[in-house]
């Protein structure tokens, strides 16, 4: 912005002779397009306006004592100042050890601009720096002052932030000298005490539990006071939740010193009782003494804190596996769930000040793990944003034994964040004041702009990757420096003694007090406390079955809901073809008609909302549905306005949150899992575009959804909709890898189902909603139909199937009634294969009086009792045949084999009919697919043909 006329006139009065001609030429270019002139010249015109001799007919006399002045020196000085802002980080004092500063940018050298200090001394500070701090008179003073701001123990990168307001806010904060805090003596003593607590705790563990893994925080101790300040600021702003995610590095110190986990509890976890039997007995399907538990540095914790009268803030540290960074989207899901008000119909009302996310990353993992980028991409999306996350990279210079030049292609570990326009502060972990200053900036930026902020906390790792590892074999030079380097507490404490804040020897007194406290706690522990804590027992309700939930609805209510779903706001003009399809649902519940899959799903959602349960439904293309069956969000063809029929329901006091997700599996799946954990009152549903793509989120399935309750007692009720079925579309559009979910099925950890009617879908979703926030709750993994089945008449259901009974884990083959006295073969299968068999039977003249068919709609928990009751009614049964369209080494066969074998008599056989073992799930040639499918059907329905016998029978 141009200055006032007097100031501008005074500035332009400095130039004479050939300089004025040069400036006139440059100004003509500037008027045509500012981008045509060099940035330093552009800055002059932006600041001072047009040269005064061009804007006034009067002869302006110089107010300076100087006569002629070389304008190139001025422009060079401006360029140098801008370079300090942009490249100062390359010369910053941010590395406590390691000599990792790297190449200092030549743009910081005076020689690059043909400048000398004498040249800068001739230029008034006001010409090149609008802030002009006290005592800064010349351009040389400006350069030195800005180097203090940009090349000290705290440095900044924000030039990549495109928003002018955000960039100016950071610029003003830094260059007005307000970036670095100046704590009082008492505040410094509190920081020292925290550092001493952390160091003392780590040293006590090191000498007391020699050689045991703990993933020490030493070298990054300043992280703890940084987190302290986040919590304090959050509480002062009445933020209710601070949601934290971090890996194992430093986790025990954070648990002890931030979350307040008792020291004796942590000490007890370092002692192991060999007699404790925690493994299942041979042949048993249950744990004898309890669940699996986890190592001490994976556990999370919660704590409520209060500073003053602003109410309580709950700190939550998420449980975390060793799979680095995958907790990030989980924590974001926690935070969004805490922010959303789901008590009214429509979309939830988000209040970002109710919760804040704090993610602590590793330097190698932040740029190495793709889930980080997936999570950062969520930060600005309406369905996933949490109003800004505070990121801290716990940068210890190494990834296990891997040096940074082998671990990343960028200069800094934080460079990934620049692509998302996230401001970056790098700070030396040996300077606690710079560290807490960085936190204050990050927090205030988040609160003001509702965006992410990243701090690269640069320190080191005192020991190896873990305390049993010897780092000197791979980084001898670095560890020679680390061995000789004092701790941050020592440096800070000695500095306070030198300044007279502490008396001489005061720091040693602080250290001794910490050591005595920890020693007394450990000595005071009883023998039982020193032993390993008792493992928790699996809740008994998980083994009690799932039959107690009522899911049927009376016909009048169902019809009323269906009618409401077909209503539209006045003036809304939907796409005619879509509306015609949806209006067909109007008579779906009348006698003689059937409700298709899309109708059954919509009725389930609507009825769940009517009963007060919020729903969150996300996934790629979920609003319409991959196979165009859902159309749960409609678009006005004239205005583009969106409308969901589920938002128009009457008498609803629960939100319906439906979102098309970004093209991500791991990130989005982790987010939805976290949302489901934090909001147990909500039915959270994630849908894969095709089930085949779900395995891009395999870590979330393995480490969280399937096992979190057994490891950590963390409960989720989320639903996974995975389109699955062989239609000749090749190996990437056929299989949701059912076998993998079944391989992980144990301890009633989740439900795995493959239902074959819209009513079954209706009941299983309503059952899942009924389990919300109860001990019976667990995830549902549901294989869903695709193009060939989703509108198939055989997948439809009559009104009675919705209004009577409930979900059937074992289901009769529709339209077929067996002659049980004559049955010699029992065919059992699941999913699309059973529809294909049903069609083949209808097309045949065969009576099939030798055959009985049962559909296993819920594969886990397996309906063993129901199937056993059926077998008892088949006195002449000779064989049980499992039929599936997947290859023999995939699908459900390897899982159901044991269950089915247990049901056999000595004279009965167990067989399987399937595609042969394959490395890929399906073939890519439609004709070959059809031939193989027909062969399976023929074998299942031909009394003289059979499948392969199960091993052991």
Curated annotation (Swiss-Prot):
Q: Which GO terms describe its cellular component?
A: cytosol; oxoglutarate dehydrogenase complex
EC class, as a word, reads oxidoreductase
What GO biological process terms does the UniProt entry carry, in alphabetical order? glycolytic process; tricarboxylic acid cycle
Q: Give the superkingdom in one word.
A: Bacteria
Q: What is this protein called?
A: 2-oxoglutarate dehydrogenase E1 component
Record key words, sorted: Glycolysis, Oxidoreductase, Thiamine pyrophosphate
Which catalytic reaction applies to this protein? N(6)-[(R)-lipoyl]-L-lysyl-[protein] + 2-oxoglutarate + H(+) = N(6)-[(R)-S(8)-succinyldihydrolipoyl]-L-lysyl-[protein] + CO2
Q: Into which family does the record put it?
A: Belongs to the alpha-ketoglutarate dehydrogenase family.
Cite the record's note on assembly.
Homodimer. Part of the 2-oxoglutarate dehydrogenase (OGDH) complex composed of E1 (2-oxoglutarate dehydrogenase), E2 (dihydrolipoamide succinyltransferase) and E3 (dihydrolipoamide dehydrogenase); the complex contains multiple copies of the three enzymatic components (E1, E2 and E3).
Instruction: Fetch the SMART domains from UniProt.
Output: Transket_pyr
This entry's Gene Ontology molecular function terms read: oxoglutarate dehydrogenase (succinyl-transferring) activity; thiamine pyrophosphate binding
Q: Which cofactor does it need?
A: thiamine diphosphate
**What function does this protein fulfil?**
E1 component of the 2-oxoglutarate dehydrogenase (OGDH) complex which catalyzes the decarboxylation of 2-oxoglutarate, the first step in the conversion of 2-oxoglutarate to succinyl-CoA and CO(2).
Q: E.C. number, please?
A: 1.2.4.2
Q: Which organism is it from?
A: Oceanobacillus iheyensis (strain DSM 14371 / CIP 107618 / JCM 11309 / KCTC 3954 / HTE831)
